[in-house]
Amino acid sequence: HLWGRLTHDVETTLQEEVGDRRAHVLQCGPAGEKLVRFAAIMNMSNRANGRTGMGAVMGSKKLKAIVVRGGKRKLAMADPEGVRAIMQPSIPAIREDEDVWDLAKHGTLGILESQNANGGLPTRNYQSGWMGYDRAAAIGGERLFNELLRGADEDDQMKLGRETCYSCAVRCKRVVDAEWQGRKIDPKSGGQEYETASVFGSYCDIDDIHAIAYANQLCNQYGVDTIAAGATMAFAINCYEEGLITSHDTGGIELGWGQAEAMIAMLEKTLSRQGFGDVLAEGSARAGAHLGNGAEDLVVAVKGAELPAHMPQVKPSLALIYAVNPFGADHQSSEHDPNYTPELIADSPEKYGKRAADLGLTNPQPEEVLNAGKVEYALKTQYAYSAMDTADVCQFVFGPAWQLLGMEELAGVITAVTGEKTTVADLLTIGARRLNMLRAFNAREGITRERDTLPKRLFEPLDGGPSHGKAVDRVEFEAALETYYEMAGWDPVSGNPRAETLEALGLGWLKPELAL
């Protein structure tokens, strides 16, 4: 009785059936049922466990939903007061920390205009890093806050227009209450964050903030990853503009840069696998291979994962991380270049400087370089982010740079909860262990070093704006790869972990999997 129904409806129905409005529901939406490659596992109707297509895995197993209810049993902790001592002072600090307060007010969408000003806002399927100041402002965080959030009419959006994950004081989630062309955008759908606004906005050269909010709603209702969905729409538009597909292919939809109605129509067909949408539902990489005739050159993805809205052309360490990351291009697998510059470390020694030093990073690098010092930064922050994933904590609360709390505080919380002394060094080892296990899994499945590469478009000069002419330097990129393999303890020929690396991490049991 739940198959084929939208996520909001399924969640409400299941909560009513178990008699608990506070019950949480994990589910695949209709897109997961239809095995859309980038279907996500949804919770709270508007939270997506995105990327990698886990919603399609649920759909393939005919598993529609899992309902979880809390009990009255208190969580046992070794040192509850130790946890409080670390966490409670952070709550009033939210307003005092400019980085975190902007996140609380605008969500991640608060960075869209600055990304554009730096020439780092992917535009027209990564052909440019700039869509103009006025057009970026039209889809940015300040406008969303002032006009689209619930409560904006009464100037009460700080209270009514934000949501939070359980027990979080930052409250970075948006609640949009608006319309697009007479179609209601339900507050239950949340609201667009930076990635979603970029992929349905600048990627497609669209500056209609209401259309973007509606696209976000569709993705949440059908249960898909917004990055993959929006980037695939941009790929399709690019193909149409280049004459690789026509309205005959798209079922009469005349795609084009800046055409919001056509983009929404194509998205709807993709989420339901109708017509040409069935091709796009495989994601841009498979769609490009299917179309051929040069369409492959318009795909902007690594290991099948579409690139997020952080550009390696202006954040060089991401060129490396996107390439080597086991599940493809991901912007939340390491810290970004602007957070490790000599100027920033000098200006903020007590925050950025200390948190870098906690990871053993004492040689800050200019934003634009990709040298050995930057590779070390990328690798060590990759270990830190990997550890945070292992601990299942939010990367907007804990982290190695701008976040509310640093890795030292995370180690302290884990120590207080478990009673087992944990240091930052321990966390980096845990992160390295996870990363090497992921890499070994890929190797067993036949994914080789040849997949540690970047799409053709990143090596082509950007067009327009502050980043005009910039491109990933292929020689510099290849040299950084070699340095990374050496620092990570991976074989430079196969790209796989060396036997001694696995042994040092307590992963010797994986050696037979890699024929070591």
Predicted segments — roles?
Residues 1-21:
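Well-ordered mid-protein domain cores that form the structural environment of catalytic cofactors
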Residues 15-18, 22-52, 58-516:
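Extended C-terminal regions of large enzymes
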